[in-house]
């Protein structure tokens, strides 16, 4: 009986020792790497909750809306400066209209390339709480928001949910390169 009890205790201790080995959380690892950005420090994730997801189709619609709104604004400004006979200002807005038009065409090209993946998830939105320590600097993330691709690439980190989708186009493959080619700046 004493031997059986010792065997059970030993089995329980072994189970606890091997069962307590915790696998690293890939989300925590990716978010921590983004927050630390290569600096020496630690990141502890206290809580995480997925709050939304966005498909490529929805993200393309958002980006198209952003560029169409910018085109409308530039067109109004161009017309206004032309009427006021201010050719330098009008020329600047004409150039902005041309860049925006190129960005819209580039977005259409990217959409064509991704046609078969439009209904796939581009990124997920999360609300989380955590803490990073870099040197002596401690940063608390209480109710912070993050957008992450299914491949665990962080594309946005912010304190306000309304700011979360400003970088959403970054989830579209080729989007940043297209912006660089057109010289267009992204605005939300």
Q: Residue locations for each model-derived region?
A:
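Sec-dependent bacterial lipoprotein signal peptides
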Residues: 1-18
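Cystatin/cathelin-like cysteine-protease inhibitor module
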Residues: 20-188
